[in-house]
Amino acid sequence: MSLNNLENHKSHIEKYGFAVINDVFSQKELEDINLVLQNIDTSKENFRKSEDLFVIRQFLKEVPEIKDLVFNENIRKVVKEIFGEKYFVVKSIYFDKPETSNWYVAYHQDLTISVDKKLELANFGPWTTKQNQFAVQPPLNVLENIYTIRIHLDDTDENNGALKVVPKSHTKGIYRPETIDWTVEKEEICNVEKGGIMLMKPLTLHGSNRTTNGKKRRVLHIEFSDIELPEVLQWSERMNG
């Protein structure tokens, strides 16, 4: 990873809503991560398994032994230099999209955060509850503050679920996908090499297509913020990197 370019990546994500950085993890680091993943007990309730997708929510909490492997020197530099000194983890999900997956995701923004309880709070809502976990749409400034790192454990292109994004859509607030004007907007595919990362703002419109090349796609999705929620509410997955 070229650390000289971090400033360029920072300006790219601010302007366009995403950036791709390759060579963030070495072959040895990837092997160590894969070893942990191979030995996971997949029967837990936070794990969702189907023919098309295997998902682990609250991934860093469920698989704590992987944290030090994920937060290598390069990732810590990215968080500090691009996001900011005080950013901490607020959500983590592992996505394993198998070789024959028909799973696809329509264009959307990531509009919810994970919190520790449900309560009436001005400008927070709507609420959803999944597996005793509370998610809520917070005020816009909270969403605008978040950065996402997607760590790619496999080479990823448009044929096995690379994210497609609408550049600069993160600057337009809540942007309903059904209102996308394709005469104005354009689509960009974010190819990422194995061991590389994609950085994204949650308000960037993004989606992915079905797998067509028979190659799997495994991604660690980690969100960061440096905002403290109103004192009655806590980030349920808060973790300092």
PLM region spans:
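Glycine- and charge-enriched low-complexity intrinsically disordered segments
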Residues: 239-240
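Non-heme Fe(II) oxygenase catalytic core, chiefly the N-lobe of the double-stranded beta-helix
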Residues: 5-8, 13-16, 25-194, 207, ...
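Glycine-centered, phosphate/nucleic-acid-interacting loop/turn motifs that mediate DNA/RNA or nucleotide
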Residues: 17, 202
